Amino acid sequence: MSKEYLFTSESVSEGHPDKVADQVSDGVLDAILATDPQARVACETLVSTGLVVISGEITTTAHPNYREIAQEVIRRIGYDNSDIGFDYKSCAVLAAINRQSADIAQGVNEGEGLDLDQGAGDQGLMFGYACNETPSLIPLPIYYAHRIMQRQSELRKDGRLNWLRPDAKSQLTVRYVDGKPVAIDTVVVSTQHSPEVSHAQITELVIEEIIKPVLPSALMQGEVRYLINPTGRFVIGGPHGDCGLTGRKIIVDTYGGAAHHGGGAFSGKDPSKVDRSAAYAGRWVAKNIVAAGLADRCEVQVAYAIGVARPVSMMIETFGTGRITDEKIVELVQRHFDLRPKAIIQELNLLRPIYGKTAAYGHFGRDEPEFTWEATDKAAALRADAGL
């Protein structure tokens, strides 16, 4: 008997207040890494009506202009007029920055601390995931939820739908049969808009110009329910409508709820923080396992102790889809991947100003060259070593 269920994932636009905060934090990180690749950065941002607050622990030889960084990020997003609730030209930017704790630095710096290798920047557990539902080996609901939001941004910025404003959310419910996506059940889009456009106009144009051009027609053969701005009005939005904070969209950033999450956010953190670098490495490992044909679905967990280089544990789960045992896959991963922080940073070339692009529309399932953790460069070797 087949198993049928509905699964839902959501995405948010670059103008969502939490994503504004993420982009400011990663904007600071990129500005620092551009001149000081060895900097230690843990940057948190709060955005509210007319206000940006940047805080955290940063040790660097760079001299970032926090106000200019924040204003440029906000301008690029599209908050350029107080009429839409936020204006990069007039918002206040406050910065309260400390240096990284010397006790933490001792455990992370290579050649210091009890472990002379570069240790993990903190304890914690991280997950990576991949599946063969889409060409990018990312779950289908989150993949298309992101595409809807990217389409909203595209039509807003090029003026084709000039009543759109930056803040928006999407949600996609997909029907699965025996673990495979077979139909789209419900699409929810809430988008900020100018006050003169009617709800009927918004509904028609969002469905016809944003949703339908993005979603695969093969999954839309049945009756699809559309819920467009279901409150009826969304004029007040962005940081004026809701306070935004760095790290509040960790499920949007990853796999849309289709996989576990260790709890650590990404944005504003340099790659010595395993919350970020090890989660990227976990995705790299899982994607190569699926690309190699070792499994249809794969979840990888790694865990670290602060100041210790090697992971304290690694677990792989293939949900009954593996061509070989999960234990055998663990052995293959241990032979083909070095998951010490320094090795991850070197292998994935993470000491570069590449993080701004990650801060909206997902850290995974992307094809831009900066997303080195999306490479399937180990797949052939894994498959050969597995004897497949």
Swiss-Prot record:
Cofactor(s) required, per the database record: Mg(2+); K(+)
Protein EC: 2.5.1.6
Positions that bind L-methionine: 57, 100, 242, 273
Record's keyword terms, sorted: ATP-binding, Cytoplasm, Magnesium, Metal-binding, Nucleotide-binding, One-carbon metabolism, Potassium, Transferase
Catalytic activity: L-methionine + ATP + H2O = S-adenosyl-L-methionine + phosphate + diphosphate
First-tier enzyme category under EC: transferase
Pathway given in the UniProt record: Amino-acid biosynthesis; S-adenosyl-L-methionine biosynthesis; S-adenosyl-L-methionine from L-methionine: step 1/1
Binding site for Mg(2+): 18
Keyword Metal-binding applies: yes
UniProt: ATP binding residues: 16, 167-169, 233-234, 242, 248-249, 265, 269
Ranges for region Flexible loop: 100-110
Database matches in CDD domains: S-AdoMet_synt
Cellular localisation: Cytoplasm
Coiled coil residues, start to end: none
GO-annotated cellular components: cytoplasm
Role this protein plays: Catalyzes the formation of S-adenosylmethionine (AdoMet) from methionine and ATP. The overall synthetic reaction is composed of two sequential steps, AdoMet formation and the subsequent tripolyphosphate hydrolysis which occurs prior to release of AdoMet from the enzyme.
Subunit comment: Homotetramer; dimer of dimers.
HAMAP family: S_AdoMet_synth1
Protein name in the entry: S-adenosylmethionine synthase
Organism: Aromatoleum aromaticum (strain DSM 19018 / LMG 30748 / EbN1)
Protein's gene: metK
